[in-house]
Amino acid sequence: MPRGQKSKLRAREKRHQARCENQDLGATQATVAEGESPSPAYLLFGDRPQNLPAAETPSIPEALQGAPSTTNAIAPVSCSSNEGASSQDEKSLGSSREAEGWKEDPLNKKVVSLVHFLLQKYETKEPITKGDMIKFVIRKDKCHFNEILKRASEHMELALGVDLKEVDPIRHYYAFFSKLDLTYDETTSDEEKIPKTGLLMIALGVIFLNGNRAPEEAVWEIMNMMGVYADRKHFLYGDPRKVMTKDLVQLKYLEYQQVPNSDPPRYEFLWGPRAHAETSKMKVLEFVAKIHDTVPSAFPSCYEEALRDEEQRTQARAAARAHTAAMANARSRTTSSSFSHAK
């Protein structure tokens, strides 16, 4: 290709890119102007489309329609919050308006499609490329690719506890990474390919915010708000009651026990030893804060408790390292002494 034509082609590509960036900025500004926050909403999926071709755009499930309404999703009971209190009617009205605004945003239909596309890729462990996302989902809205991918990634993070990251910036390949140090997903069978870290993190958050022990009904109340019901099979989590009261208990991430002296018997959830070992109160609080679109310090008492927990963990790690070093030195001296006596 002649040099002049190459220059014109590059100039045309730059103009197209600038036009796309301006459109993305305009879309974001319009969203804010309408009163809808562009920050992540907690996306729990409703009914999964049956045999959905990747190229189709599904209708927005009921559970998605209220996606922005997250401020009361995991309401602190034991932990006081700095956020201003308002009446329940005002909150409900605001949530309804947010839900309507979310549905009216045309980009969110693409977000829903992309989330389902990513779930299919996760289940089949097929490579994820920018080209495929544009070809099968984004299509004519490729100018908004970055914004759509950002929203979909945030929903995947909060719902499933996984991060979507670009691993090959040249060929634009993407891959999923576990957000936390939890190893629960490594223990699942081949049939259970969807991670349940998000469900576990919700439960751990409810427990922590309820003074480190949460009544069973309080946990299910939160789950219900997010479209997860104990007596209804969920297409991501399967049998939620079994996952919560058996699977996660057997794996020692949760403890499920009868409330002492309760008659009729009532049950409660606590953190299991594996949860204490593999995550921390600060990580869980950060997860909860992200759901609320705020910062951990917005929950002062829980934040202080999480800071104390972090300090204790730091001291424990330092003590463990010191003990390991002392043992190594002792073995070294013993070996050296034995060698000297042998001479």
From Swiss-Prot:
GO-annotated biological processes = negative regulation of transcription by RNA polymerase II
Polar residues compositional bias, start-end: 67-87, 334-343
GO cellular component labels? cytoplasm; nucleus
Biased composition range(s): Low complexity: 316-333
Q: Which residues form the MAGE domain?
A: 107-306
Q: Which UniProt keywords apply?
A: Cytoplasm, Tumor antigen, Ubl conjugation pathway
> Which InterPro entries has this protein been placed in?
MAGE (IPR037445), MAGE_N (IPR021072), MAGE_WH1 (IPR041898), MAGE_WH2 (IPR041899), MHD_dom (IPR002190)
Its localization reads: Cytoplasm
**Chain residue ranges for the region called Disordered:** 1-102, 313-343
Compositional bias of type Basic residues: which residue ranges?
1-17
Which is one Pfam family of this protein? MAGE
Instruction: Provide the residue span(s) of the region labelled Interaction with LNX1.
Output: 100-343
User: Which PROSITE patterns does the record associate with it?
Assistant: MAGE
Principal location: cytoplasm
Q: Where is the composition biased (Basic and acidic residues)?
A: 88-102
How is this protein organized at the quaternary level? Interacts with LNX1.
Describe the task this protein carries out: May enhance ubiquitin ligase activity of RING-type zinc finger-containing E3 ubiquitin-protein ligases. Proposed to act through recruitment and/or stabilization of the Ubl-conjugating enzyme (E2) at the E3:substrate complex.
Q: What is the recorded name of this protein?
A: Melanoma-associated antigen B18
Gene encoding this polypeptide? MAGEB18
